[in-house]
């Protein structure tokens, strides 16, 4: 994470969660300074919408670099076509999040990852946590882009673990 306070808070909760092999670090996701091929998993949850196009490519390349062969990069990002994002970006009912500088579509997110060297293992739209709306999303998102809440992509670095 980029926020020291968030990293400190997460690290403070690891003991209670019984997670001894997990550490949160404050770093620039474009150039972490971590050793190459040193991680099994990279999670980019609600990150890519905050990155400009060139930074998105750099972050994907850095994730690829730090993952071991066979390692996984999991991406979770808002879908720009969802009704809540459409309303928010027009300041209708919801306030626009100015930190969301570049929403990615599903094909574009996959292109960013494959250009970095990843193979896409799974890509789907995930429904929201809002009751009622999530049922409609689950049933209809295939045909109604306004109901595609989240883009979820699991990408793998080729090679044997």
PLM-predicted stretches and their roles:
Residues 31-36:
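Short conserved loop adjoining the S-adenosyl-L-methionine
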